[in-house]
């Protein structure tokens, strides 16, 4: 059974990790341990580079805390221009897979708060009245009326981040 470290305590992100591992490796083949680690970037990362760095740093920190695990997974959400998105980083042994999620264009009212230094989750909770919306459906779920959720969008990106770990062609290339 794989020991998977989720470098997050956010239930929406943990659910996405679980769904991706179910799809790629099968239910019952892993156990997820969530841990709280620092991303070494601001609470609300701005830009592609800062957000990707946050996901990578989470994995690096998780490996230091739980070096005996099989997988380490970092998920970092960020803002670029007028959109929210996230980076997924998965490491297994010396193999790393990365993927960026789909993006959602945010309304100016939300962006104004972010420009003033507040987090997207805070702005969404204020706008919607939903406490901890960032740990539930997120902005994605709210603005798509539940057609997509934070979990469903991250689930897809996590499957893509797992490709270098499980696909035979990648394994052959990594063995060379």
Curated annotation (Swiss-Prot):
It holds the Pfam family NTPase_I-T. Its EC number is 3.6.1.73. Binds 1 divalent metal cation per subunit; can use either Mg(2+) or Mn(2+). Disulfide bonds: none annotated. InterPro entries: ITPase-like_fam, Non_canon_purine_NTPase, NTPase/PRRC1, YjjX_NTPase. It is an enzyme of class 3 (hydrolase). One of its GO terms (biological process) is thiamine metabolic process. Keywords: Hydrolase, Magnesium, Manganese, Metal-binding, Nucleotide metabolism, Nucleotide-binding. Mg(2+) binds at residues 38, 68. Phosphatase that hydrolyzes non-canonical purine nucleotides such as XTP and ITP to their respective diphosphate derivatives. Probably excludes non-canonical purines from DNA/RNA precursor pool, thus preventing their incorporation into DNA/RNA and avoiding chromosomal lesions. This is Inosine/xanthosine triphosphatase. It comes from Photorhabdus laumondii subsp. laumondii (strain DSM 15139 / CIP 105565 / TT01).
């Amino acid at each position: 059974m794989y020991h998977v470290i989720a470098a997050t305590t956010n239930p929406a992100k943990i659910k996405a990790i679980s769904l991706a591992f179910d799809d790629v490796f099968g239910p019952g083949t892993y156990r997820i341990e969530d841990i709280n680690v620092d991303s070494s970037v601001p609470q609300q990362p701005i830009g592609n580079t800062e957000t990707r760095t946050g996901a990578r740093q989470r994995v690096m920190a998780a490996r230091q805390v739980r070096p005996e695990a099989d997988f380490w997974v970092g998920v970092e959400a960020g803002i670029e221009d007028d959109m929210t998105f996230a980076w997924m980083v998965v490491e297994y042994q010396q193999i790393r897979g990365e993927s960026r999620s789909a993006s959602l264009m945010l309304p100016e009212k939300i962006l104004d708060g972010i420009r003033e230094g507040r987090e997207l989750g805070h702005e969404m909770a204020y706008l919607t009245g939903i406490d901890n919306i960032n740990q539930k459906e997120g902005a994605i779920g709210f603005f798509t009326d539940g057609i997509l959720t934070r979990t469903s969008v991250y689930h897809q990106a996590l499957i893509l981040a797992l490709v270098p770990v499980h696909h035979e062609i990648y394994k052959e290339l990594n063995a060379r």
